[in-house]
């Protein structure tokens, strides 16, 4: 009986030892970019125009975060292009897209600009129509950019189109009239 108790005690100590986190082990910091890169749009594509533009905004915010590294920028660029309409993707190679993006990010970082927050049109403000180009939606994204202590708002108007799988894809965007 005493031998059984001893064996159980040794087993409990062993289990506790292997399940105790190592205080010296490297910890992985979960950044916004890391979280964004774990998303799988093939399995869980955003369902509405607003959700697609929200994903675009989240990725954009990650691009300009100083903690986002070069490999993450490439991965985020891949993700962003999954939100784009085929015609938009066809207008620029991936390499050109990433080169242009990195150049813009470098300018933002050198000027210490940061996207602090954003807002997307409410669902009731999304305009939808069907015409010879397909089913389209128009909505707005406002990026709040912190620049030298001030917050500057950049308002963009987005055009999205449903593809053959009924996924909303970004056809393009332009700077909107600033109010």
Indicate residue ranges for each PLM-predicted region.
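Short beta-strand edge/turn micro-motifs at domain boundaries
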Residues: 22-28, 151-179
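Hydrophobic core residues within well-ordered beta-strands of beta-rich domains
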Residues: 52, 137, 154-156
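Short low-complexity stretches enriched in small and charged residues
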Residues: 10-15, 36, 73-74, 90-97, ...
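Surface-exposed, charged secondary-structure patches
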Residues: 101-146
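Extracytoplasmic/secreted cell-surface and envelope-processing proteins
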Residues: 1, 148-150
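Amphipathic, hydrophobic N-terminal targeting peptides for secretion and organelle import
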Residues: 1-36
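Core segments of small alpha/beta cavity-forming domains
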Residues: 33-110
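A mature extracytoplasmic/lumenal domain signature
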Residues: 95, 124, 141-145, 156-158, ...
């Amino acid at each position: 009986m005493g031998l059984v108790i001893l064996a159980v005690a040794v087993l409990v100590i062993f289990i506790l030892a292997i399940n105790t986190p190592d205080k010296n082990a490297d910890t992985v910091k979960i950044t916004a970019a890391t979280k964004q890169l774990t998303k799988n749009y093939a399995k869980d594509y955003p369902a509405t125009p607003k959700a697609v533009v929200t994903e675009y905004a989240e990725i954009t915010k990650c691009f300009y975060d100083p903690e986002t590294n070069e490999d993450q920028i490439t991965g985020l660029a891949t993700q962003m292009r999954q939100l784009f309409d085929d015609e938009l993707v066809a207008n620029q190679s991936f390499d050109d897209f990433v080169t242009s993006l990195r150049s813009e990010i470098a300018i933002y970082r050198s000027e210490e600009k940061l996207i602090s927050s954003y807002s997307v049109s409410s669902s009731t403000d999304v305009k939808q129509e069907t015409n010879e180009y397909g089913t389209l939606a128009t909505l707005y994204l406002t990026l709040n950019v912190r620049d030298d202590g001030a917050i500057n708002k950049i308002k963009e108007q987005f055009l999205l189109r449903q593809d053959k799988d009924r996924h909303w894809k970004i056809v393009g965007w332009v700077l909107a009239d600033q109010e």
